[in-house]
Amino acid sequence: DKVTCDFMNTSWNGLCMEDQRFQAVSIPMKNTRMTLVLPGKGVSFDQISSTESIREILELCDPECTKWKQGLVKLSLPKLQFQSDMDLIPMLQEMGIRDAFQEEKADFGCIWQENGKETSEPDLYVSQARQAGAVKVDENGCSVASYTEITIKESMMIPDIKMKMKCNRPFIMILSDDQGTPLFAGAVSRIE
């Protein structure tokens, strides 16, 4: 299916390369560069996205790569904007990191501190690991944002003591800092 879209057009004297499999250009930017790789005519995207081809394409990102030639580059590029959101747990498990995600096997004792002192840690485990990113390319340049979020939860052991507390009559409330110093104290005498 063909889609109609606006293209940004530019030309400059810069780095480019071409062989039977693909064309590539290197676009200089402030403190970085963008490399664009386009499959050659009659070459499928799958052919240039094989592991071997990707290794060769990644070599183009090396500033010392000798495959680049200096030339007049005329580029037509559509405006781009896309986002991704990926669950990292399956990939991390495939890399051999498994115990961190299991309540009964995770061991984060080496990083657990309370009030600046090592203590016996609660049962912590990684409940979520995500990475999200966004890329936007337009006339103003390229902007990229990315973040990784790892959520660590405390597994709940069912305690021997059970208590039910319903604050439906006057009660006292005290807010204190982590040193135990009261910051605010008050009494709730009437609930409306």
Residue ranges and their predicted role:
Residues 1-192:
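Hydrophobic-core positions in well-structured secondary-structure elements of globular domains
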